[in-house]
Amino acid sequence: AALNIDANSRIRNESGFKSIFIPPCTSDSGLCLGAAAWSYFCENGEVPKQSPYLGPNEPTILDQVEDLAKELSERKVIGLVTGRSETGPRALGHRSIIARADNVDLRRTLSEYMKKREWYRPVAPVMLESVAETMLSDYAPGDRLAEYMLGTYHVREEYLDKFSGVVHANGTVRALVLKDNREPLFRILVELLEKY
């Protein structure tokens, strides 16, 4: 149920909770991690924030980020494998298929042909938090659902063309918002793409 982005967004918008956190491993695979976190919390009163990247490790490709940005600017679709793999069902940048967010043809290629998704369920954009604050009308700084693509956000009308390849039929996106320096590769890549 925690992968239901519409339900999560309604909880965020209508529940009155100040903060909602859903871990990236929302299925039964996360039960043992949740039990361990609860035990730690009971003993220590808090649980340190952990990384969602707990899987096998691959070499990072930070030295190739400029080449990646150039390939993306040429409207290419790229398979990305770098660092430790994600835990949970969402591709959070270490095992991902990436493309530009502003191209409807790429949406068809990536979402419908490669990932076999329905036309109304496009893939998700990745953006810096400063961009999310500007382009998404209902994004608030620190929104925890955006850390693992577990909520939807309305795109401001003047920016819909920038998200034409990833926007849902109702004008929302399931965004991965980069905060702090958690993902240096994607952060640098997104910054470089602004040049193209």
Residue ranges and their predicted role:
Residues 2-196:
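Flexible beta->alpha loop and helix N-cap segments adjacent to enzyme active/binding sites
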